[in-house]
Amino acid sequence: MPEALALALYAAALRLLTPFYLLRLWRRGAKEALYRHALGERLGLHSGHAEPGRLWIHAVSLGETRAASALIDALRARDPALRFLLTHSTATGREAGESLLRDGDSQAWLPYDTPGAVRRFLRHWQPRVGVLMETEVWPTLQREAEAAGVPMVLANARLSEKSLRQGLRFASLMRPAARRMTLALAQTEADAERIRMMGTARVEVAGNLKYDIAVDPALIARGQAWAAQLGRPVLMLAVSREGEEAALLAEWVKQPAPRPLLAIVPRHPQRFDEIAALIEGAGFQLARRSSWAGEPPAEALQADVWLGDSMREMPLYYGLANVALLGGSFEPLGGQNLIEAAACGCPVLAGPHTFNFAEAAALAIQAGAAQRCRDLAEAVSRGLLLCANIGQRDAMAVDAMAFAAAHRGAARRMAESVLCLA
């Protein structure tokens, strides 16, 4: 199919779907109010005047925003006068991004990928360069940015074999979008090769920004202090996805007492209440992190399961846990970021599905920072053994921190490449 026809059909479909997207956001805003904030921005509608020439970074959700924080720090270190525009697509991303703003910076929703919305967005902000985090490539945005003379960079770029196949299925849309990318800064050589196959001409291997994310030592220390108060080991399911919590609870109920404390930290905040009901329905005494502000109360210290229903406290949870089971890896979802756990010195047990972080998982296992398990049953068994074996657990913790430290430097490399275009 010719590119022009493919783009026209794509834009027409998005225009038809836009009212339904907006209605969905409004309904979602009943639980997460931020989704109802500034809905006009989704259509590229902005009030007032914006100072042109900002460095624009788009981070779709929480994980991408945290990776962007390392890049922003590196860019500011090289040019303190830079002013940023941060855009997001999810409430968790926007909430996390707000903490990265300084005087003169701005924040907005990324507009829907229709020609009118994207043109209005680019006319209003007039960025000097656009940086898209990880996998965000939008056909209309790429075309309109090229027309407006805005160089576009795909930073911390990754592309799995599955995503490559999907992209090639829609080659008339995605190949031109990839060709219009000024520069892609890939996490690995394998990612770089797949991105070149999509059509991007200039691709550099820069490493993974997630090794450079600063972890708050005060939060780690707080988690460690809580662990000392508990007086028993802690096994955690970290950044869990749908289906994993129920499967873990089914395994956990089989384990003989006395058991370690089980902590569950879900990936999506809208599922907190659902997971709480699952835990109580399985017959366990539950303590919710959101129920106390200071030190954990006595009833929490005696609970069977802690639910990590708070935001931006993962270093605290990794400081609390003796061993972390990697969420998203026990269902075919690609896994979650294990680098943060390693940086906090928390040993990781991963399931079979880590294709979204394939190289990081392989390197962590090779370094002794993580172990691979066939399924949750094996992970629980190994986790209990590690909880009981202080020497092996401490050795994995040391290896984890060394692994994380050895792979830093991507933020500096990416900042230098981006500033060459700005």
What would you call each of these model-derived segments?
Residues 1-422:
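Nucleotide-activated sugar donor-binding and catalytic core shared by glycosyltransferases
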